[in-house]
Swiss-Prot record:
One of its GO terms (cellular component) is cytosol. Residues 573-680 form the tRNA-binding domain. Belongs to the class-I aminoacyl-tRNA synthetase family. Pfam families: Anticodon_3, tRNA-synt_1g, tRNA_bind. This is Probable methionine--tRNA ligase, cytoplasmic. ATP binds at residue 349. A motif ('KMSKS' region) lies at residues 346-350. GO terms for biological process: methionyl-tRNA aminoacylation. The lineage of its organism: Eukaryota, Amoebozoa, Evosea, Eumycetozoa, Dictyostelia. The gene is metS. It comes from Dictyostelium discoideum. Disulfide bonds: none annotated. NCBIfam families: metG, PRK00133.1.
């Protein structure tokens, strides 16, 4: 009953029409648990609640696909931005499906609808006089790339906290927003060369002209929309005093084109463009999207996001819509979360720290347990920390409180010969029964109040408190002792508990829908909408429950907890090979062997090594000079016809024994990689053995080339933990 409609709902006069959005996840990585609880999962609970209340609602989300992060990710993986977006859109979609996220539409921003709607909003803002153009100083890569560097194409030292790998738009060390020109010792992310400062013309949204309208919007909607204190504080840092013009264009190719001849080589900045994705994704869902997005009188817009996204949704996006003067539906309710951190620090895919969506699935723990844990620990007012001990504690709470209540009651009804799985008559209630009904009804009032306020964590606690009331009622009335002695009272207790379980399955459906589906199956009933009171006859006497009663939740074993804590701690498997990128300086014929080259390699700075290699039949000298390629440096040095070889050049071999059978292993983007750069799998601990015997050890390592991707023990190898190592020519083969 909390699932989306088969046909797109539209707003209706006289009904509650709620438009729900979750912050659009970016497509440059896999979502971690903090991303999931901060946006899509929280919005999913509220959307399911609204459907169970018979509110007219839709839940819209999708991948945010334009901007510098996509272009830089595409460079690092050696593919196009479109290919990156396709890949990560599917990854996100699969993870959210596994987590049972009930979008009405999960779309993407790289669509024609996005271009049309974003350009239309911009043109209206411009025509209404709310834009201006200014020349700004911007970093330009003059040595290699010959292009202006948008924010994420620049890295350097943060001027505030001195973090050395701050991005041009924000520092990951102190979270402060930055301009690229503020960085100390900036460097181009593509080629690592220092850029210069040049002037370039950009378009700004003239926020000072919109100040009064934005102030009024914030004043009215922050109070009426239940914004958190932190969200209001973050917004006020922007609007208190005086708003400043905000640049809305970037020197990029991957994005929504600016519809002006003078700026035809520029695209819209992601934080002007991305929130419009909510609108364009709705337009992909229904042709009548304007009935949702241009209907502020009848539609409430409820948006979910992490605290770092607040100012773009409370200032930039509303200001853009106000400036268009096109009667857009503006943000009403804002539900934000603080940060969820991992027990050993921040989530990091590259360092294998923390649980990401794909990792959660790989544990084999059902998604409902993850949902239950995350929603119990939703960081609503302060940052929270994921810990495996607490995860185990919450799993036991779900098992012992709700899971055992369902299992005990249904099994007792099935195994008692007096009932044989058929719900008994309840008859007249005694004072104990009436007290239970009264307490449950009081809890229901609180439950609905908290869900209306979008206090999701409190709503879950209240539902579990009702389950606890059921357990206490069962313990106090001891139906196992009544069986055979007073079957009428035994049946009455079980029938009341059966109906309490049905009520609980509806209350918990927004939180753990797959698990409550199982409860409905075992009760042999269809899901229903909410009831505002405890109906003890919702499942009538004479109804037969399922004969197959299975445990809903399993205990987590201590050994599994230990295994997962180690797996996600950032302590990866050891990589025993000293593998680096080298640049070929010289290639000479071996003085005593016709089939060998003697190759001089640079490993950065003044460090050089000599490699004697049997690749002469496959490559001309001219094909090697200046090439950046992978080498192994900890093989036992060997003499070949009197010449000492200190390194081995790696190749992929397709086994066909032709001149084209060998392929060098190279960076996917050689310009960005320096000689001496280390190679290993992400999250691996690089611990080279002092020496490796080629015949006895190296040939037995699982080094493979599949679809040009180089892997060790089925883990992809990267240069500097970021740049993929790939085969230059052949697609599949053995690495040697």
């Amino acid at each position: 009953m909390s699932k989306p409609s088969n046909t797109p709902p539209l707003p209706k006069d006289g009904e509650r029409n709620i438009l729900i959005t979750s912050a659009l996840p970016y497509v440059n990585n896999v979502p971690h648990l903090g991303n999931i609880i901060g946006c899509v999962l929280s919005a999913d609970v509220y959307a399911r609640y609204c459907r169970l209340k018979n509110y007219n609602c839709i839940y819209i989300c999708g991948t945010d696909e334009y901007g510098t992060a996509t272009e830089t990710k595409a460079l690092s993986e050696g593919c196009t931005p479109k290919e990156i977006c396709d890949k990560y859109h599917e990854i996100h979609k699969e993870i959210y499906e596994w987590f049972n996220i009930s979008f009405d539409k999960f779309g993407r921003t790289s669509t024609n609808s996005q271009t049309e709607i974003a350009q239309d909003i911009f043109n209206k803002i411009k025509d209404n006089g709310y834009t201006l153009t200014q020349e700004i100083e911007q970093l330009y890569c003059e040595q290699t790339c010959k292009m202006f560097l948008a924010d994420r194409f620049v890295e350097g030292t943060c001027p505030h906290c001195k973090f050395e790998d701050a991005r041009g738009d924000q520092c990951d060390g102190c979270s402060k927003l930055l301009n690229p020109t503020e960085l100390i010792n900036p460097r181009c992310k593509v080629c690592s060369k220092p850029p210069v400062i040049k002037s370039t013309k950009h378009i700004f949204i003239d926020l000072p002209q919109l100040q009064q309208q934005v102030d009024q919007f914030v004043e009215t909607n922050s109070k009426g929309g239940n914004w958190s204190e932190n969200s209001i504080a973050i917004t006020n840092t922007w609007v208190k005093g005086e708003l400043k013009p905000r640049c809305i264009t970037r020197d990029l190719k991957w994005g929504t084109p600016v519809p002006m001849e003078e700026f035809k080589d520029k695209v819209f900045y992601v934080w002007f463009d991305a929130p419009i994705g909510y609108i364009s994704i709705t337009a992909e869902y229904t042709n009548e999207w304007e009935k949702w997005w241009k209907n502020p009188e009848n539609v409430k817009l409820v948006q979910f996001m992490g605290k770092d996204n607040v100012p773009f949704h409370t200032v930039i996006f509303p200001a853009s819509l106000i400036g268009s003067k096109d009667n857009y539906t503006l943000l009403n309710n804002l539900s934000t979360t603080e940060f969820l951190n991992y027990e050993t620090g921040k989530f990091s895919k590259s360092r294998n720290t923390g649980v990401f969506g794909d990792g959660a699935k790989a544990t084999g723990i059902p998604s409902e347990v993850w949902r239950f844990y995350l929603l119990n620990n939703r960081p609503e007012s302060s940052d929270s920390i994921f810990s495996w001990d607490d995860f185990n504690f919450k799993n036991n709470e779900l098992l012992n409180n709700f899971g055992n209540l369902v299992n005990r009651v249904l099994k007792m009804l099935n195994t008692n010969a007096a009932f044989n799985g058929v719900v008994p008559k309840i008859g007249e209630l005694n004072e104990v029964d009436k007290k239970l009904v009264q307490e449950v009804d009081e809890h229901l009032v609180q439950y609905f109040q908290k869900l209306e306020e979008i206090s999701l964590k409190e709503g879950l606690k209240i539902a579990m408190s009702i389950s606890k009331l059921g357990n206490t009622y069962m313990q106090d009335n001891k139906p196992w002792d009544l069986s055979g002695k007073d079957n009428e009272r035994c049946g009455q207790v079980l029938a009341i508990l059966i109906n309490l379980i049905k009520l609980l399955s509806t209350l918990l459906e927004p939180y753990i829908p797959s698990l409550t589906d199982k409860v409905h199956q075992q009760l042999n009933v269809e899901p229903t909408k909410y009831s505002t009171h405890f109906d003890i006859n919702a499942i009538p006497a004479g109804h037969e429950i399922s004969k197959e009663i299975l445990p809903l939740v399993k205990k987590i074993e201590a050994d599994d907890l230990k295994k997962w804590r180690t797996k996600f701690s950032g302590i990866g498997p050891e990589f025993p090979i000293d593998m680096k990128i080298a640049t070929v300086l010289e290639v000479n014929d071996h003085p005593s062997a016709e089939n060998l080259y003697v190759i001089k390699l640079s490993l950065g700075g003044d460090q050089t090594k000599t490699a004697v290699s049997g690749i002469k039949a496959n490559f001309e000298k001219s094909q090697l000079i200046g090439k950046k390629l992978a080498v192994v440096l900890n093989l036992k040095p060997s003499k070949f016809k009197g010449v000492l070889s200190e390194a081995m050049i790696l190749v992929a071999d397709d086994g066909q024994a032709t001149k084209e059978s060998l392929s060098f292993l190279v960076p996917s983007n050689p310009q960005s990689i320096e000689a001496g750069s280390k190679i290993a799998g992400k999250g691996m601990s690089i611990k080279p053995k002092p020496t490796i015997d080629y015949q006895k050890e190296f040939l037995h390592y699982d080094l493979t080339c599949i679809d040009k991707i180089i892997s060790y023990n089925k883990s992809q190898l990267f240069i500097n933990q970021n740049e993929p190592l790939v085969s230059e020519k052949i697609g599949n083969g053995k690495v040697r």
